[in-house]
């Protein structure tokens, strides 16, 4: 079951890379983001067959946020946010 979760995350990552390539930014024109606006907690669910107890154990301490450009240190890309408020990347830690 752990392999299924990992495989699902990798598939979502591959789809995201194909769907929206990240634009290259120049270091001089890079603007600082406002942390309060983009930090939105998102609930995550795993669909499909499997033991609900296992799914609860996997998601128990998982905290996810919709980010605009990239995940913060310690977070990983887990998919694409369904809300389209300028934050398409789903980052979880």
From Swiss-Prot:
Its primary localisation, in coarse terms, equals: secreted
What tissues has this protein been observed in?
Small intestine. Not present in heart, liver, spleen, kidney, large intestine and colon.
Q: Which GO terms describe its biological process?
A: antibacterial humoral response; antimicrobial humoral immune response mediated by antimicrobial peptide; cellular response to lipopolysaccharide; defense response to Gram-negative bacterium; defense response to Gram-positive bacterium; disruption of plasma membrane integrity in another organism; innate immune response in mucosa
| Regions crossing the membrane | none
- Alphabetically ordered keywords of this record: Antibiotic, Antimicrobial, Defensin, Disulfide bond, Secreted, Signal
Q: Which family does it belong to?
A: Belongs to the alpha-defensin family.
Q: What does this protein do?
A: Probably contributes to the antimicrobial barrier function of the small intestine.
Protein name per UniProt: Defensin 5
């Amino acid at each position: 079951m752990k392999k299924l979760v990992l495989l699902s995350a990798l598939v979502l990552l591959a789809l995201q890379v194909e769907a929206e390539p990240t634009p290259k930014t120049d270091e001089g024109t890079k603007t600082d983001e406002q942390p309060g606006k983009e930090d939105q907690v998102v609930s995550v669910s795993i669909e499909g067959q499997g033991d609900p107890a296992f799914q609860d154990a996997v998601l128990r301490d998982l905290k996810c946020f919709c980010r605009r450009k990239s995940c913060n240190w310690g977070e990983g890309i887990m998919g694409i946010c369904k809300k389209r408020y300028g934050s398409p990347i789903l980052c979880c830690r």
